[in-house]
Amino acid sequence: MSSKYPRSVRCCLPLCALTLEAALILLFYFFTHYDASLEDQKGLVASYQVGQDLTVMAAIGFGFLTSSFRRHSWSSVAFNLFMLALGVQWAILLDGFLSQFPPGKVVITLFSIRLATMSALSVLISAGAVLGYVNLVQLVVMVLVEVTALGTMRMVISNIFNTDYHMNMTHFYVFAAYFGVTVAWCLPKPLPDIKEDKDQIATIPSLSAMLGTLFLWMFWPSFNSALLRSPIERKNAVFNTYYALAVSVVTAISVSSLAHPQGKINMTYMHNAVLAGGVAVGTSCHLITSPWLAMVLGLVAGLISIGGAKCLPGCCNRVLGIHDSSVMHYNFSLLGLLGEITYIVLMVLHTVGAGNGMVGFQVLVSTGELSLALAIAVTSGLLTGLLLNLKIWKAPHAAKYFDDQVFWKFPHLAVGF
């Protein structure tokens, strides 16, 4: 039996991270340059504000959203920032290399930084399913593989189906969620007694997680509209996301109270359920021209999120062998699928309304894009899970899952650290 004492990454982490950072610096030196075009000041400020909103979502929103565990709050916040910083650098280079043929110098613009931040956000969503199981060295591997897989998926879908930037990211939620769940399925499962002790929600960390939720709630409209070019589509995306988020908040709080025998509200459900409308409407937010449809989507999404939080964890743990600590499956993958179905229905209605007889073709194309995204997510997730199980990464023992003391310096350490 392997030792339960934590495995030190003192040599492995600095060597891996700093070598990778040096390689990225060299790549930026030889293959990138800034955009030399003269943008108008108003457009530059507006573009920067959207990028700033995305960064706040990633660093504060997702960072604190996963910090509710009693003994794993420090790692959740800091590891998310580490993955964001690394993921943005790699995504800028990768997107630049994949978007031009033959390859040449990568032109860095505010839009490319925005796109790279969204790619890094995919990693933060996926990491919610594995935080507590892995160390920083393993997360470095996960960042590199997932950003590469997402960039490849976008390039393949763009070349096959001739879609724009926004449509390339419509499968973002489904890809990130199923990638993360697949990786979690490959990792060793936590010991039952350790899980009961450490995988618990504490009051103060839970309040911090709610703070992350509030930041995400405020900036989600910017996220859904970040890659849209048309002013009308951007306006629709912002309005519809706000309506869907508002309804999902009311639904989440009401149904959470209904689901409890004494009518009490579960704060754990609130962390994700109040965001359900933003996830569900993300794929089709630019197509919806009336607020009532966005509100219906927010209502359905809130019901799915609360219902999933109450009923699905046992099924995932027992049947699928997935310990989904951050409720990734029913808060992103199921709601992402709801958004995909809504998009297909809206596209069919638009095609019929325009008198176009290509309804079957449109359904086939949309279904093909979704199937391809799922296939790449699961395949790359399996590859990542197998890589993370290699002993060279010095993964934490199952007895040390969900424990900040494995990674952080504390004034008074417990015995065994």
Curated annotation (Swiss-Prot):
It is found in: Membrane. The keyword Metal-binding does not apply. One of its GO terms (molecular function) is ammonium channel activity. It comes from the Eukaryota. One of its GO terms (biological process) is ammonium homeostasis. Keywords: Membrane, Transmembrane, Transmembrane helix. It holds the Pfam family Ammonium_transp. One of its GO terms (cellular component) is plasma membrane. InterPro entries: Ammonium/urea_transptr, NH4_transpt_AmtB-like_dom, RhesusRHD. Its main location: membrane. The chain crosses the membrane at residues 12-32, 44-64, 77-97, 125-145, 172-192, 203-223, 238-258, 265-285, 287-307, 331-351, 358-378. It is a multi-pass membrane protein. May be part of an oligomeric complex which is likely to have a transport or channel function in the erythrocyte membrane. Belongs to the ammonium transporter (TC 2.A.49) family. Rh subfamily. This is RH-like protein IC. It comes from Gorilla gorilla gorilla (Western lowland gorilla).
